[in-house]
Amino acid sequence: MAESMDIIELIDSDDRFGPTNALLPASGRTDLKEWQKSVQSLLRTLQRPRYVATGLLPEFQQLDARNAFIQNNQLPHYDKAEWKSSDMSLQEKLQIYADAMADDPAPLIEELNARLVALDDIVYCEHYCTEGGLSLDDVDLWARLRSITVIGGVDWPKGLRKYMDNISELADVPTYDGMAI
């Protein structure tokens, strides 16, 4: 995500790409960062297997691409170094992803729903997450929230859902609701 944010900042500040400064800089809000940290493991467990399982995202339509994603993106309770070690085969990783998809997601989704309610309380309004206008905070947060839409059964708080839909429309980038599993 850090490299993507660097690219966005470059494009937004260089007039070769069009009008500049369309986005306010990141605010440095610690509450947003804390929320993101609080759901990291939960989202990895729910999202990553679903990305691969949908088969609908262009980047996962080829078997080699799905395998590369699985090879490089650990699920909890593995750390990155352990996951990437040569001690774990692709077959073992595929099985871990399959097991994650087979597990009942209801308890994790219930926890996620509660965390979304907490986030709804700190998102400034339905048009941007930080007071002052559209900023790099929105680019970061919306991308993370968009990835949640691949998870079926999530109950979005009304304000947060409006925020998601507004940014989706503004950016002309759809959510994954239609392929949620």
Cite the ranges covered by each PLM segment.
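A mid-sequence, solvent-exposed acidic-amphipathic segment
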Residues: 81, 85-128
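Alpha-helical membrane-targeting segments
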Residues: 61-63, 67-101, 180-181
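Non-transmembrane alpha-helical segments in soluble domains
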Residues: 8, 12, 33-36, 113-116, ...
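GST superfamily/GST-like fold recognition
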Residues: 129-150
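GST-like domain detector, emphasizing the conserved glutathione-binding G-site
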Residues: 1-78
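Short helix-to-loop capping/linker segments positioned immediately adjacent to catalytic or ligand/cofactor-binding
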Residues: 21, 47, 124-131
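Structural helix-adjacent loops and short alpha-helical linkers that scaffold large soluble proteins
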Residues: 153-158
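Charge-dense, extended regions
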Residues: 166-181
